[in-house]
Amino acid sequence: DISRYQHEPSSQTVRRGRRRRKVTYPILWNQLRITSLGSMSKKRVEGNVDYPISFIYIKSTEGKSLTNRYFRADYAAARKHGYRVGAYHFFSTRTTARQQADNFIKNSRYQKGDLPPALDVEPSAAQISQMGGIRVLLKSVRSWLEDVGHRLGVQPILYVSQSFVNKYLTDDNPDGDYLRKNYQVWIARYGEYKPDVHLAIWQLSPDGRVRGIRGLVDINVFNGFEEAFRDFSSISAHSLPQPSPR
């Protein structure tokens, strides 16, 4: 997955006239190949790493108003070069689910055949506390997923860490239990992994390398064979169970 950090991998600046601007780098779309799984992946690979890329998630929005200035160009270029592409939203604990859903839908380009929208949830313990606790957070996460799913007609997926699953997507948190049972998960888990959720995508490394991209790149693997991958975007929002009373 990519965001503005693949275009701006450091704080390096260059002077242009009277101003200094960040050094930016293009993505060389016709050269993309995975060349390293990174230091945090425990996968053992014989020989050189040189893998093709079949799908790309691009950060679109964050919170109620932040956007990725590179999203539209990267989205169009990825599709032009034949990659399956999806957009993701970085969840904020400082604003409502509805405002964040509005921001995502307004600024993302979901088209038929794209990968399902994804919600990236990575709050710290302090942020959860400031929001009002885990039950408030989970209710807001669920609201975003249901709202976006209803408005786009496709069921989003949930990006979380293994520790988030273990702590919060449990049967003693009603909304957490609902999310675990009814949504596919894109999980960040570094090392060997036996899925204990409805796994869609496994992020096996946050520090991989891809030819054609400057800086580090998250490396992700789809959980399934080619036929399942082709069907991945056809997960209808309307196939979800009716929301339980809250």
Language-model-detected regions and their locations in the chain:
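Catalytic domains of cell-wall/extracellular-matrix polysaccharide-remodeling enzymes
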Residues: 116-196
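Low-complexity, flexible helical/coil segments
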Residues: 90-96, 120-128, 154-155, 219-228, ...
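Functionally critical loop-and-helix segments that line ligand-binding/catalytic clefts
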Residues: 1-46, 174-246
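Substrate-binding cleft of extracellular glycoside hydrolase catalytic domains
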Residues: 1-151
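Flexible, glycine-rich phosphate/dinucleotide-binding loops
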Residues: 65, 94, 165, 194, ...
